Regions:
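Short, solvent-exposed loop/turn segments at secondary-structure boundaries
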Residues: 13-14, 101-105, 168-172
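Short, small-residue-rich loop/turn micro-motifs
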Residues: 1-5, 92-94, 160
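Conserved G/P- and acidic residue-centered "switch" motifs that form tight phosphate/ATP-binding loops
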Residues: 44
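Canonical Radical SAM [4Fe-4S] cluster-binding loop centered on the CxxxCxxC motif
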Residues: 1-18
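Short, solvent-exposed loop/turn segments at secondary-structure junctions
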Residues: 7-8, 48-49, 74, 165-166
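Radical SAM/AdoMet-radical enzyme domain recognition
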Residues: 17-39, 47-149
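Flexible glycine/acidic-rich beta-alpha junction loops that bind and position SAM and/or redox cofactors
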Residues: 136-137, 157-178
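A short, flexible beta-alpha/helix-coil linker loop
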Residues: 6-11, 95-97, 163-165
Length: 178
């Protein structure tokens, strides 16, 4: 989230994407060189078929984490924990439905993400929440998100809106510096 539109972008053909076996080989070859952590990111890693099987393939002495938008977390949290995932970071920029849907360009609701976070906690996963704060969009969400997770073991991090090229409509005026 949000939906990104990449006109005229040449995506890799499926056969050019590394298989889980190839990714595991790369990870295993880096462990003797000091690799201690692996983070699965996206797009959305929970859209990847059989992601739990991939996690099981990774050396279990690693700290294995995932960053997700949280929309599928309720469905997969238990299996993720059983497969060896240690931590999950959930992107959540608002908990009021209007801001959540506008910022994410989605019809989904923040309640879906909040249920996923709670399911992940109950499954034994360590949970962090990242909230990207944008002036004129969701600065009012800082207090609401803080209140929602105060007194829980969920770590909340507020992040500056960053320039990542031409895909997110970044403007300096939307940055609230930390």
């Amino acid at each position: 989230m949000p939906r990104e539109h990449f006109e005229n972008h040449d995506f890799l053909d499926k056969q050019e994407i590394l298989s889980y076996e190839e990714l595991t080989l790369v990870v295993e070859s880096l462990v003797p060189l000091g690799l201690a952590k692996v983070r699965l990111t996206g797009g959305e890693p929970l859209l990847r078929r059989d992601v739990c099987d991939f996690i099981k393939m990774l050396p279990q002495e690693l700290d294995i984490a995932m960053t997700t938008n949280g929309l599928l977390l309720e469905k997969y949290a238990h299996d993720l924990a059983l497969s060896g995932l240690n931590r999950v970071t959930v992107s959540l920029d608002a908990i009021d439905i209007e801001t959540f849907q506008a910022m994410g360009d989605t019809k989904d609701t923040p309640e879906t993400v909040l249920r996923g976070i709670e399911t992940a906690r109950k499954a034994g996963l360590s949970v962090k929440v990242n909230c990207v704060v944008r002036a004129g969009y969701n600065e009012h969400s800082v207090e609401k998100i803080t209140e929602r997770f105060i007194g829980t073991d969920v770590v909340v991090r507020f992040i500056e809106f960053m320039d990542v090229g031409r895909t997110n409509g970044w403007t300096l005026g939307e940055v609230i510096p930390s």
